[in-house]
């Protein structure tokens, strides 16, 4: 059954169960107009006014009622650890200087795998491990969130 969506919401308390779930990578979650294929072979025509970066848990509101939940796919990432908090800030600076998408968490940074960057980080004294996790990088200083109506965004 084909669906159409022109609106994205962040979930609020007491949301109903979604009709379907759609698992997308970080790169796939940045979109505006696209035909999305669900696991059951149904399709959703997403047609938004502006490009958005969908977050894990966002809801595609379907014309005619219901919604589809967006899930962040596990991706091949590097888990970067530092000797101390100052060293972690230095590593983050080097990654930011290269304009790399990065998820900064307490005690670690996550980035997409790149052997050249891994060698640089290890040369700077970082511990770099390969992990497979959903990727939620920080938005840049010039990023504008494209959601119209929403309850929360974390």
From Swiss-Prot:
GO molecular function, one term: unfolded protein binding
Gene3D superfamilies: Urease metallochaperone UreE, N-terminal domain, UreE, C-terminal domain
Keywords, comma-separated and alphabetical: Chaperone, Cytoplasm, Nickel, Nickel insertion
Record keyword Membrane present: no
One GO-annotated biological process of the protein: urea metabolic process
Keyword Zinc-finger: no
GO CC aspect terms: cytoplasm
Protein's cellular compartments: Cytoplasm
Family: Belongs to the UreE family.
HAMAP family in the record: UreE
Described function: Involved in urease metallocenter assembly. Binds nickel. Probably functions as a nickel donor during metallocenter assembly.
Name of this chain's protein: Urease accessory protein UreE
Taxonomic lineage of the native organism: Bacteria, Pseudomonadati, Pseudomonadota, Alphaproteobacteria, Hyphomicrobiales
């Amino acid at each position: 059954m084909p669906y159409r969506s022109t609106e994205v919401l962040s979930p609020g308390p007491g949301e109903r169960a979604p009709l379907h779930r759609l698992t997308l990578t970080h790169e796939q979650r940045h979109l505006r107009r696209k035909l999305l294929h669900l696991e059951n072979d149904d399709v959703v025509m997403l047609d938004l006014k502006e490009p958005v970066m969908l977050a894990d848990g966002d809801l595609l509101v379907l014309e005619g009622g219901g919604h589809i939940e967006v899930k962040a796919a596990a991706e091949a990432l590097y888990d970067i650890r530092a000797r101390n908090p100052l060293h972690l800030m230095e590593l983050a600076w080097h990654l930011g200087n290269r304009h790399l998408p990065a998820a900064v968490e307490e005690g670690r940074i996550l980035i997409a795998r790149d052997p050249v960057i891994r060698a640089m980080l290890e040369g700077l004294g970082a511990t770099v491990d390969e992990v497979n996790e959903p990727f939620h990088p920080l938005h840049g200083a010039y990023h504008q969130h494209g959601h119209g109506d929403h309850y929360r965004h974390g």
